[in-house]
Amino acid sequence: MLDPNLLRNEPDAVAEKLARRGFKLDVDKLGALEERRKVLQVKTENLQAERNSRSKSIGQAKARGEDIEPLRLEVNKLGEELDAAKAELDALQAEIRDIALTIPNLPADEVPVGKDENDNVEVSRWGTPREFDFEVRDHVTLGEMHSGLDFAAAVKLTGSRFVVMKGQIARMHRALSQFMLDLHTEQHGYSENYVPYLVNQDTLYGTGQLPKFAGDLFHTRPLEEEADTSNYALIPTAEVPLTNLVRGEIIDEDDLPIKMTAHTPCFRSEAGSYGRDTRGLIRMHQFDKVEMVQIVRPEDSMAALEEMTGHAEKVLQLLGLPYRKIILCTGDMGFGACKTYDLEVWIPAQNTYREISSCSNVWDFQARRMQARCRSKSDKKTRLVHTLNGSGLAVGRTLVAVMENYQQADGRIEVPEVLRPYMNGLEYIG
């Protein structure tokens, strides 16, 4: 959520920045609502003061032995007017808040202006795509050769966009997640967390999934005996529970940064993706991801974004997977991001790079929703923290990249050296 004071005091400047990302802010509507809010605020305060004054007069008149009935009726009338004004003010403030919850974050000044993914800017490349002297197989074919990817079984169990992994392919999938967690905890300074896969509405509001993206979530049916408290949704990413761990907290600045990681399944409806990536593991309703989250001082967040992106890059480098780093343009960034880097890994069978990590600085956009603050040791003042999140990495897509980049002419899959300790020294699948 944007700073309400910024919306009130600099609406045109905010509208200009939001226009860079294709969002039209209705400045006139917000201005009219704000003017009405000011009028109602003053009216409410005046009625409150008048009622207090008249209430005090009742006691004084009673002490003088005067008839207090006219004053009492006047106080009652003022009370009714005050209640009506408060109700109108509350409704107006709720309307303003509902609008504010649909407004995306402002883009950082250095973010390239653009409409969609075609306007993203490549920053760098690492590694050289391998040249094969045989016909490249895609991961689906390789998975079927080794009886490791069973999409038909998943359709029987659930439906499309799910998979059953088996044998050494399932083992490599597990090895990848363990390798990522060990790297981030042992070398990059993150603490490992195990978090719920079901979260409540407040949590989803905190990180910005609600109210705007309710349709992208899988919602549970509330338990009849807990209807008021069990309205849960499956997490679309571990960013949601990890970031919300600081919701409502005041953190000493000396305890920052807080760096957290978790390996979880992620659940997404993929609304609007009908017909895209229908083959294989690229776009699933359920997929595993190792997530990184940082909670930092505001002045440290841009440096933290560079660091976090480097941590995701390290996973790809140690696996020997060619990739490119791009900065997303204003029109392609996520709702809460002010700046985002995507890492795209080389997928031989598609002869292209595909997203495997997205690392974003969210500034105080989530912290304002969550009321997550830090306290200075010197003056004891509090301010909103900045939050960052990044994939380190999407495990299924990493499996795809390893299978395809490490395939052999006979269909075997070489196990990258860094994964062999997690697979009992296995050098090849097949």
Swiss-Prot record:
PANTHER family: SERINE--TRNA LIGASE, SERYL-TRNA SYNTHETASE
Name of the protein in its database record: Serine--tRNA ligase
GO biological process: selenocysteine biosynthetic process; seryl-tRNA aminoacylation
Pfam families: Seryl_tRNA_N (PF02403), tRNA-synt_2b (PF00587)
Family annotation (InterPro entries): aa-tRNA-synt_IIb, aa-tRNA-synth_II, aa-tRNA-synth_II/BPL/LPL, Ser-tRNA-ligase_type_1, Ser-tRNA-synth_1_N, SerRS_1_N_sf, SerRS_core, tRNA-bd_arm
Catalytic EC class: ligase
Signal peptide coordinates: none
GO terms of molecular function: ATP binding; identical protein binding; magnesium ion binding; serine-tRNA ligase activity
Residues reported to bind L-serine: T237, A238, E239, E291, S391
Annotated ATP binding sites: R268, S269, E270, E355, I356, S357, S358
A GO term from the CC aspect: cytosol
Annotated gene: serS
Reactions it catalyzes: tRNA(Ser) + L-serine + ATP = L-seryl-tRNA(Ser) + AMP + diphosphate + H(+); tRNA(Sec) + L-serine + ATP = L-seryl-tRNA(Sec) + AMP + diphosphate + H(+)
Family to which this protein belongs: Belongs to the class-II aminoacyl-tRNA synthetase family. Type-1 seryl-tRNA synthetase subfamily.
Predominant cellular place of this UniProt entry's protein: cytoplasm
Subcellular location: Cytoplasm
UniProt lineage: Bacteria, Pseudomonadati, Pseudomonadota, Gammaproteobacteria, Enterobacterales
